């Protein structure tokens, strides 16, 4: 089963389905900047904003990650895990965070370098076209019990997500 997104008007096939509101987040094993495995369980008891992007080295991905970081400054983020997951190596993620003005303290960058299973399970693995093998752009928000409260598969990879809906879902899940 696959979805379609587009890039500059060209249709691109994406494997699977993004987790829908009301469903449980799929488990994952990803890699942090220190090359340590991280699982969904490492973020238990926190609300989660999972932002999946093609590459942190693109302007839209970089700018939108910074925007989420800024928006989280307005939230009580001690109980929030903001995970940004590009299809990049941990070294690129660390370099991007280090070069940012404030170091992006609200974001935990994770990499799929050891497996693309995360991208399949979260319905974002691009199957066709020149970007095959990396991820589409998506946002998934879940509560402390890993129940999805909001998800968006951005229909055009070159566009930004709906920040306001994601943040509203994140803050509403605290109540």
Regions inferred by a protein language model and the residue ranges of each:
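Chalcogenol-based redox active-site neighborhoods
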Residues: 1-175
């Amino acid at each position: 089963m696959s979805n379609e997104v587009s890039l500059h008007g060209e249709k691109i096939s994406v494997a699977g389905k993004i987790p829908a509101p009301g469903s449980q987040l799929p488990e994952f094993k990803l890699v942090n900047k220190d090359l340590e495995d991280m699982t969904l369980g490492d973020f238990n008891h926190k609300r989660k904003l999972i932002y999946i992007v093609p590459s942190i080295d693109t302007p839209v991905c970089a700018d939108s990650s910074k925007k989420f970081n800024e928006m989280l400054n307005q939230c009580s983020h001690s109980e929030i895990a903001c995970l940004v997951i590009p299809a990049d190596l941990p070294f690129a993620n660390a370099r991007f965070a280090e070069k940012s003005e404030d170091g992006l303290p609200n974001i935990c960058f994770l990499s799929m370098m050891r497996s693309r299973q995360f991208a399949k399970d979260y319905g974002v693995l691009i199957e066709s076209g020149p970007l095959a093998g990396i991820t589409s752009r998506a946002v998934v928000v879940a509560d402390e019990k890993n129940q999805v409260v909001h998800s968006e598969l951005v229909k055009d990879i070159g566009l930004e997500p709906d920040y306001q809906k994601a943040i509203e879902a994140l803050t509403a899940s605290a109540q």
